[in-house]
């Protein structure tokens, strides 16, 4: 029953517009379900399985509603429920002066809104917060994550210009 509820939440997040934000692509929250039995063979029935859900809420939404539904489903089924990491989504208006200033320094015309989590969620107390950097997100967070050296050099150049602009 717990996994059924996790699947219901996943499907609701995909189909219910109250969980969508069209500034992002894709416009849906992330509710990524994983199950680990810690077995090495498919014909072994383990004494315990672990269900993990990677949840990335969208700005302006109360993700605690879904966390509480999950907690209640776990309690109803006698399961342990923990939230090891929790952070608010990062959002800075792409038309604000700070973003415009970064765009000018970066030599770019337009900011884009991205739909992935970062460690920046731990820095949301900062008043001016954006995520920027080199490379392609398509190369990141894969089993063979990598970045081209020319992209790394471009990133170092951008960070140098930003530091010189605000710190020197």
Where in the sequence are the language-model features?
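Metal-dependent amide/peptide-bond hydrolase catalytic core
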Residues: 1-168
